[in-house]
């Protein structure tokens, strides 16, 4: 059977379920696939609860995470949906970015209201830049008291507002994932309403090719008689021959030059696009002017920095991480895109030390500048071994 080609006709959106353990994230994920498979049978196939629940292990930057990926379509959009069953998996997934979310469905049990993990997930969602949250008040079939439902809704809106989400206007949809799976009409409709709210409210993400050009430098070499070539995988944007570019990071000063040719496997290309591995021939650039770890960018689109705040997950001993805690002034390497840079860590006030398996905020000062922007991901390494992973939450200098 021929492999089905990926239809590019619809906007593609990455979404995930977040919320407290046992509030029904995985059941809701299964219910969405079933309801949509019944509603649009030619577009979808249902996934049973246990197909979502036994999430396969994935390695992301050396960290093992259990994450389930399902896909489904509404009339308007194609969705890729991630569900991390365990709380620790969810935290790791958010911070290491095994799955980038364009929006999230926050699952809150109407019988419980927001719980500690609900708060932590919403906080993390804000820190890692999830743009929009739609709320599913699950298990609503078990709450007869209308006032109680309203109270839970109020608490959830309050929680969203406290983390700078639009709590006043976020859609809050009472659902029953279990009843929807059982085919109860009222609750099947509730899941359809939920997906309509996701369609209408989660903003369509900007495609990578539409963003300003950025390519991390992986290798640099000289072609006699032609000049210096840098190779790497284009992270975003499109570059044309004779475009001006800027080389940013590692060195004190950024430099500008022109790309005279773009090549892939020794063939000349008309352009370089997001996702492609290419070689760029740089005009008048010496081999020693460029090095791995720098980035080739659209001029002025990104700046080099040495100081930032971050949210970090530290690997546990079982995950191959450190065996003992670390304190402020710890000096590991920070691996950004293609290279390691040493940095000094300052822990937040009130945090004396960080244990393996913890997640924490920290401030970092690097010894060399890195082309940096909010939410940029990095690994923390000691002698080439990954001991943590994090994201930039704020650039400070």
From Swiss-Prot:
Location(s), subcellular: Cytoplasm
Any one GO molecular-function label of the UniProt entry: translation elongation factor activity
Residue numbers spanned by region G5: 176-178
Principal place of residence: cytoplasm
Keyword Isomerase: no
Stretch list, region G3: 83-86
Region (G4): 138-141
tr-type G domain residues: 10-206
Stretch list, region G1: 19-26
Enzymatic reactions: GTP + H2O = GDP + phosphate + H(+)
Top EC class, one word: hydrolase
Keywords per UniProt: Cytoplasm, Elongation factor, GTP-binding, Hydrolase, Magnesium, Metal-binding, Nucleotide-binding, Protein biosynthesis
Keyword GTP-binding: yes
Domain of life, per lineage: Bacteria
Region (G2): 62-66
Binding site for GTP: 19-26, 83-87, 138-141
Binding site for Mg(2+): 26
Disulfide feature: none
PROSITE patterns in UniProt: G_TR_1, G_TR_2
Any one annotated GO CC term: cytosol
Function: GTP hydrolase that promotes the GTP-dependent binding of aminoacyl-tRNA to the A-site of ribosomes during protein biosynthesis.
Record note on quaternary structure: Monomer.
Protein name: Elongation factor Tu
Organism field: Brevibacterium linens
Taxonomy of the source species: Bacteria, Bacillati, Actinomycetota, Actinomycetes, Micrococcales
Gene of this entry: tuf
């Amino acid at each position: 059977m021929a492999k089905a080609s990926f239809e590019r006709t619809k906007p593609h959106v990455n979404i995930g379920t977040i919320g407290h353990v046992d509030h029904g994230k995985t059941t809701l994920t299964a219910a969405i696939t079933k309801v949509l498979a019944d509603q649009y049978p030619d577009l979808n196939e249902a996934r049973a609860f246990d197909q979502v629940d036994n999430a396969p292990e994935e390695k992301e930057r050396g960290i093992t995470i259990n994450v389930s990926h399902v896909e489904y379509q509404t009339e308007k959009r194609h969705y890729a949906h991630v569900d991390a069953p365990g709380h620790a998996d969810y935290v790791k997934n958010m911070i290491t970015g095994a799955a980038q979310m364009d929006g999230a469905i926050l699952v809150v049990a109407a019988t419980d209201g927001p719980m500690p993990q609900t708060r932590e997930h919403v906080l993390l969602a804000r820190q890692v830049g999830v743009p929009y949250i739609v709320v599913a008040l699950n298990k609503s079939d078990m709450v007869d008291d209308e006032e109680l439902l309203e109270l839970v809704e109020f608490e959830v809106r309050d929680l969203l507002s406290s983390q700078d989400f639009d709590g006043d206007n976020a859609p809050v949809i009472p659902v029953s994932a279990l009843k929807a799976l059982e085919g109860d009409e009222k609750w099947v409709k509730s899941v359809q309403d939920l997906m309509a709210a996701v369609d209408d409210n989660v903003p369509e993400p900007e495609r990578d090719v539409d963003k300003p050009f950025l390519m991390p430098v992986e290798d640099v070499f000289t072609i006699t008689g032609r000049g210096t070539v840098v190779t790497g995988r284009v992270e975003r944007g499109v570059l044309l021959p004779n475009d001006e570019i800027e080389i940013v990071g590692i060195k004190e000063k950024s430099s500008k030059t022109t790309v005279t040719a773009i090549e892939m496997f020794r063939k000349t290309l008309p352009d370089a696009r997001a996702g492609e591995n290419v070689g760029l021939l740089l005009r008048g650039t010496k081999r020693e002017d460029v090095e791995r770890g720098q980035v080739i960018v659209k001029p002025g689109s990104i700046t080099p920095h040495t100081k930032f705040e971050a949210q970090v997950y530290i690997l546990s001993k079982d995950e191959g991480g450190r065996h003992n805690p670390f304190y402020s002034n710890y000096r590991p390497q920070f691996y950004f895109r293609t290279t390691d840079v040493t940095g000094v860590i300052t822990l937040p006030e009130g945090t004396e030390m960080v244990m393996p398996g913890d997640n924490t905020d920290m401030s970092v000062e690097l010894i060399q500048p890195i082309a940096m922007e909010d939410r940029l991901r990095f690994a923390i390494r000691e002698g080439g071994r990954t001991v943590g992973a994090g994201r930039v939450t704020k650039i400070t200098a």
